């Protein structure tokens, strides 16, 4: 715990209190009237503040200090896994193209295990030994929120693009299957055994995927622990809210997240950003555009609320899934114009055979 000698066990006691959903794992500047002031504090996250304070039983009030350090109570709302269809604010209309069939499919579009709703294809990585490409997203996107306590997925499960929620004419594996579940880290509902990641990887079929993240491009590096700093600017490309930017609000936190088969799961050493996502954006890759290192993979977006979004860190993800940066995969060249299939939506009434007859006309000079 990066709190100058304070025992985390002392801080963890606040999780027993009403509405407490997490805490920062490092001392933070206290927030007063929306602005940070130069007073170190232990940040405690609650789903909502009870006002007036007198309405809250004394035994459920967060102490004003822990081991002599002031506490700072921050209201973040209910934090939920964002592959579910949730009532959280949207940034305009969901980008419709991202919910269509894409072949080859770029990161940033709809994807999912055949038993979920829909999430986001985060990025393309490589197996650390073989170098084979891997589709990377969240456990609750690619592995149906498989848990240590109860299993919901097996290796080889069908991965669909777009995700099931976006397939309106019935799932056809010949059309929609893009790969198979290969590896994942089970999540847990045990608050004392919190995970650091919600991540999984799938093996794609042949040349059906691209490495260039939609609206971002190829990754150049993987974030290190020292890179995670408050106010670091990040961007992401997601199924629902498309491309947008945010900043790190807490570089290391413990948080309880609901939406895992009706259970709440615990995560530690994850990071918060300013709100940048909605239901269906889970699995999006957080990217830092560094002047020195290029586009740096910083982690996977996996949860959020009406005021914050939560990511698991890149170095945890690649370490646990035994992956490395994918290099040397050139963009797939487009076929000749007369042979190129147009992109089409699965909810427009077309059959696959009808769609195959549609061609893109060559541009006229």
Where are these predicted regions, by residue range?
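C-terminal subregion of chymotrypsin/trypsin-like serine protease catalytic domains
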Residues: 174, 287-365
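Surface-exposed flexible segments
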Residues: 52-67, 213-222, 310-320
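Generic alpha-helix signal with a bias toward terminal, lower-confidence helices
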Residues: 32-35, 56-58, 83-85, 147, ...
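Protease-domain processing segments flanking chymotrypsin-fold serine proteases, especially trypsin-like
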Residues: 4, 8-19, 24-35, 41-46, ...
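Serine endopeptidase catalytic core focused on the charge-relay Asp
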Residues: 90-270, 274, 279, 287-293, ...
